[in-house]
Amino acid sequence: MVAAVVLAAGASSRYGTDPPKQHVHLAAVLAALEASVVDEVVVVSGAHPLPIESVHCPDWEQGPGASLRCGLAALSDETEAAIVVLADGPDLDPRAVDRVIEHWRADGGDDILVANYETGTRFHPVLIPRALWPSTPDEGFKGWQPGRLVDCSDLTPPGDVDFSPAGS
């Protein structure tokens, strides 16, 4: 079983907007995950609690690692791997999610898998096998070295509204 962890706990302080930027794009991210092969979805909130069933991360100010640990801790015991996506990545393609999961299912192992796009950009989705969950770095999945890159060069990267003109 593979579960998705959607990180939506930040304060959106760079934007100073209401609603928070990650909540604006959350519906698109959730729709992409619904269209993928993930078995379960957990949304991690923090600075701005969500009016949906989500995991609240009281330590969200400690950074993405804290949010990731909250999300991973909420997953069922049957979950073998987590596919992590960002709530402020509005153009998530479910084919990228499926491709990363299928690559892991075919080869197994305890390596981090990262989508690798045409631009050479390594970006989410990121698959983290259960064996690595206890060693989650404070900076979240950015702190891990990817063990394997999954070719998503035919797909558009999901973007990040902090940095992508498409998200503004």
Explain the meaning of each model-derived region.
Residues 51-60, 148:
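Active-site regions of enzymes building and remodeling cell-envelope glycoconjugates
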Residues 61-130, 134-135:
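Conserved beta-loop-beta/alpha segment of the NTase-like Rossmann-fold superfamily
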Residues 133-168:
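Conserved alpha/beta core of the MobA/IspD/sugar-nucleotide pyrophosphorylase nucleotidyltransferase superfamily
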Residues 1-45, 97-100:
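N-terminal glycine-rich phosphate-binding loop and ensuing alpha1 helix
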Residues 10-13, 47-48, 60, 87-90:
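Short glycine-rich anion-binding loops that position phosphate/pyrophosphate groups of nucleotides
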Residues 7-9, 44, 85-87, 115-117, ...:
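Short beta-strand segments
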Residues 39-47, 115, 136:
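Short, hydrophobic beta-strand segments that form beta-sheet elements in well-ordered domains
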